[in-house]
């Protein structure tokens, strides 16, 4: 019998990165730009050297675990029944919600979406999913990764999750510095009333 939460998260992660690919194609078709597939910044190009194999592993590991993988790649026996299994089911459902929420963010960004920090002028989006969180796409990516690690609690998957969360923080900080330099006071005001990955409970003073 197949492990349902594992299958669900494998499909969800694959659809997530298929959506990223679709956004790249969309921006390229509309603007004749590469949407940041090859970053402009040297710093981000260095990050890509880690991120590309990380993403490939994120996609592959759940599928490998569904196909009678080696024990160190498979769902541990303790996670297949009872409360751990119920937690894994819940994580798989949250993962689906992350995918749907990310799709809403993609729709709102439209042709302003990019994978990298770009010299191309883009709008500062502060409404919709971005009204209370500066990086909702990154936040949902982090949560989806955590859900994947909960569904597949193996050493390789957990290590990839820790690395991904770390890179998301580095990427967000780099992007914020760029946006502050481009949008100035407008971005400073936006940052003061929003959180990076979760809504801010209080607004920072000037």
Predicted regions and their residues:
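Membrane-anchoring alpha-helices and their flanking helix-loop junctions
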Residues: 1-126, 144-206
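Histidine-centered phosphotransfer motif of kinases
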Residues: 131-139
């Amino acid at each position: 019998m197949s492990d349902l939460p594992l299958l669900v998260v494998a499909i969800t992660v694959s659809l997530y990165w298929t959506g990223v690919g679709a956004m790249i194609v969309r921006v390229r078709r509309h603007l004749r730009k590469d949407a940041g597939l090859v970053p402009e910044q040297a710093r981000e190009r260095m990050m890509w050297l880690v991120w590309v194999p990380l993403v490939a592993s994120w996609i592959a590991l759940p599928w490998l675990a569904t196909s009678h993988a080696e024990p160190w790649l498979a769902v541990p026996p303790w996670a297949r029944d009872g409360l751990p299994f119920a937690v894994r089911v819940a994580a798989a459902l949250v993962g689906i919600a992350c995918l749907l929420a990310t799709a809403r963010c993609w729709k709102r960004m439209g042709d302003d979406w990019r994978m990298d920090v770009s010299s191309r002028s883009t709008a500062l989006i502060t409404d919709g999913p971005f009204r209370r969180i500066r990086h909702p796409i990154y936040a949902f990516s982090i949560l989806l990764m955590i859900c994947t690690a909960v569904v597949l609690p193996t050493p390789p998957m957990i290590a990839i999750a820790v690395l991904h969360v770390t890179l998301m923080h580095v990427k967000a900080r780099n992007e914020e510095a760029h946006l502050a330099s481009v949008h100035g006071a407008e971005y400073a005001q936006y940052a003061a009333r929003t959180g990076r990955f979760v809504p801010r409970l209080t607004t920072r003073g000037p």
